[in-house]
Structures are given as structure tokens and as C-alpha cells.
Curated annotation (Swiss-Prot):
Keywords: Membrane, Transmembrane, Transmembrane helix
Record membrane topology: Single-pass membrane protein
UniProt organism field: Saccharomyces cerevisiae (strain ATCC 204508 / S288c) (Baker's yeast)
GO cellular component assignments: membrane
TM region(s), chain numbering: 13-35
Name recorded for this polypeptide: Uncharacterized protein YGR146C-A
Subcellular location: Membrane
Length: 53
């Protein structure tokens, strides 16, 4: 899905929660992430992803 393998990251995003703390991975690109999962992915009940460097 185009995720950037810049760091190790395990994340879980619910539709109503887009403020997941990302401080442990300062190199993570929010812009790239949101552009990657823009609709029609949002209608999913939840998006769970695991990124390995």
C-alpha cells in the first residue's frame, strides 16, 4: 500500500481516531500515510497496519 519502511511501527487507526501518537517514529510521513489510505479505505471498520524497516 505504499508505506514507507523508514522505521519499525505497529499502528491501529479507528475511523474516529486519527491522532495516534507517532512520537516514537519521528521520521514517519503523515502526508504519505494519509494519501495512501484516503477513501475508499476509510469506510473500513478499522485499519490495522504493521510496518517493518
Amino acid at each position: 500500500m505504499g508505506f514507507l519502511p523508514e522505521c519499525n511501527l505497529t499502528c491501529a487507526f479507528l475511523l474516529h481516531s486519527f491522532t495516534f501518537p507517532i512520537a516514537h517514529c519521528p521520521s514517519f510521513s503523515w502526508a504519505s500515510f494519509f494519501f495512501t489510505i484516503r477513501p475508499p479505505f476509510f469506510p473500513k471498520l478499522a485499519l490495522v497496519c504493521t510496518i517493518f524497516s
